[in-house]
């Protein structure tokens, strides 16, 4: 790792050898991918048929990706599988169902960053070859051979985009052209959200936007804030479950104490008591409808910013009521 990594940036190294001391044709660290010490395999150049040596290399790289040898219950569609314990003289084409499961376990549990990012084109040292489905220097696209290409935007013969192409992908791109202006690309997800529409000049949907803060929502029961419609009932539900609702107004009066539990905000380590008009912007109080318990509160439960605290007023980030 001290020599090869300094020569060229790489995620994994597969080393070809002529002679092995043991009766094997390949070795690799299982689950070593992306580890600078263990992301490596050693493969014996055991056959004049390149495809068979490549199969062995794929097998060892499979080990690096956290995949073990197949067992009797594994299958890849009736063919000899790449991670089989037994060497086949027939070309191996597929990983088994067991291999796929182990691979995804490796990806999701260990989150190996080196194979989750797209390599720079400049990191590819082999000469660019149009038609190998690998986007390399000098290419705008590479969809494989002209016979196999399924990319409408790409000229498979030149690995360049067709002259008429406006876009390749995106919410506002369809068959390599911008979708007409006005077509909705992101519908509103909730009441305080707004729909976004394509501009006709870009493949990307415009930035997600929402209704202006202070606009009424929930039949004037609350006001929009940062795309949400915050109300104390929903906050009580999140803290105490379906039997909880907002407590009566008298419960909030203790927020004027300014002690460890009941206050509006913290300034220089001091709990500042709520002014009378701000009491519903401090500690949140809930009522348990099942057990008729009033004034329930949680150490995590301060009234959310933007919550309606009086007619025409909401709580701001300073835990103060202000005119919407």
Swiss-Prot record:
PTM (free text): N-glycosylated.
pH-dependence of activity, as noted: Optimum pH is 7.5-9.3 with dimethyl casein as substrate.
Tissue expr: Expressed by the venom gland.
Keywords, comma-separated and alphabetical: Calcium, Disulfide bond, Fibrinogenolytic toxin, Fibrinolytic toxin, Glycoprotein, Hemorrhagic toxin, Hemostasis impairing toxin, Hydrolase, Metal-binding, Metalloprotease, Platelet aggregation inhibiting toxin, Protease, Secreted, Toxin, Zinc
GO molecular-function term, one example from the UniProt record: toxin activity
Record EC number: 3.4.24.-
Ligand binding (Zn(2+)): 59, 63, 69
Motif D/ECD-tripeptide: chain residues: 191-193
Subcellular location field: Secreted
All copies of domain Disintegrin, residue ranges: 127-213
BP terms from Gene Ontology: proteolysis; venom-mediated disruption of extracellular matrix in another organism; venom-mediated fibrinogenolysis in another organism
Catalytic-site annotation from UniProt: 60
Domain Peptidase M12B: 1-119
Name this polypeptide is given: Zinc metalloproteinase leucurolysin-B
Organism of this sequence: Bothrops leucurus
Taxonomic lineage of the native organism: Eukaryota, Metazoa, Chordata, Craniata, Vertebrata
């Amino acid at each position: 790792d001290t020599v090869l990594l300094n020569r060229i940036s790489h995620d994994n190294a597969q080393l070809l050898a002529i002679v092995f001391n043991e009766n094997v044709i390949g070795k690799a660290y299982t689950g070593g991918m992306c580890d600078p010490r263990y992301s490596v395999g050693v493969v014996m150049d055991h056959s004049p048929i390149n495809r068979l040596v490549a199969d062995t290399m794929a097998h060892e790289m499979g080990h690096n990706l956290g995949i073990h040898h197949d067992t009797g219950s594994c299958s890849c569609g009736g063919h000899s599988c790449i991670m089989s314990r037994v060497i086949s003289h027939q070309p191996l084409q597929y990983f088994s169902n067991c291999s796929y499961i182990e691979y995804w376990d490796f990806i999701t549990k260990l989150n190996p960053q080196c194979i989750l990012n797209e390599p720079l084109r400049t990191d590819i040292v082999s000469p660019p070859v149009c038609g190998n489905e690998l986007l390399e220097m000098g290419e705008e696209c590479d969809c494989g051979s002209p016979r196999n290409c399924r990319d409408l935007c790409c000229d498979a013969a030149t690995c360049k985009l067709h002259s008429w192409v406006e876009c390749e992908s995106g919410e506002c791109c369809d068959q390599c052209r911008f979708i007409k202006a006005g077509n909705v690309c992101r519908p509103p997800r909730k009441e305080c959200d707004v729909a976004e529409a394509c501009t006709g000049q870009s493949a990307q949907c415009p930035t997600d936007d929402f209704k202006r803060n202070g606009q009424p929502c929930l039949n004037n029961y609350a006001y929009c804030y940062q795309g949400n419609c915050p109300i104390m009932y929903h906050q009580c539900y999140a803290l105490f479950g379906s039997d909880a609702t907002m407590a009566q107004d008298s419960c909030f009066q203790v927020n004027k104490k300014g002690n460890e539990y009941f206050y509006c905000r913290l300034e220089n380590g001091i709990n500042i008591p709520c002014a009378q008009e701000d009491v519903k912007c401090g500690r949140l109080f809930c009522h348990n409808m099942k057990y008729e318990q009033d004034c329930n509160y949680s150490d995590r439960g301060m009234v959310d910013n933007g919550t309606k605290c009086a007619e025409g007023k909401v709580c701001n980030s300073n835990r103060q009521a202000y005119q919407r």
